[in-house]
Amino acid sequence: MSHFTKIQTTIKDLNLLKHALTDLGLIWNTNSFNVKVGENSQHKVDILIKQGNLSHIGFVWNDNQYHLVADLQLWEQPWSLEVFLDKLSQKYAYHSIIEETKKQGFEKAEQVYQKDGSIKLIVQRWNY
């Protein structure tokens, strides 16, 4: 039995989502695709991540944010769904911070991965 699910995220920026997925080592495609849902239906997604079992997962724009679309019974990623969403959120936030600090004239000086899995990010700006 299929357990097709749409999971709400806080992801709003397509480019940052692409960077986060790439950081996680996932291969994605942004052409418009349909994800098979159950036996006889499909769901259009904006970003497709192929899985070996042909039950692919994707992200679909829903008015103001992206939703993850997947059949949870056929989830075939190296992490559980919860760990995947945590890692994706962390990478998305990282790229969001980098992008925003660049807009304000900062550059990344250092990043340190902490024992608890968090990332300590140090940015700097030179005043002339």
From Swiss-Prot:
The keyword Lipid metabolism does not apply. Keywords: Chloroplast, Plastid. It is found in: Plastid, Chloroplast. GO terms for cellular component: chloroplast. The keyword Lipid biosynthesis does not apply. Belongs to the ycf35 family. This is Uncharacterized protein ycf35. The gene is ycf35.
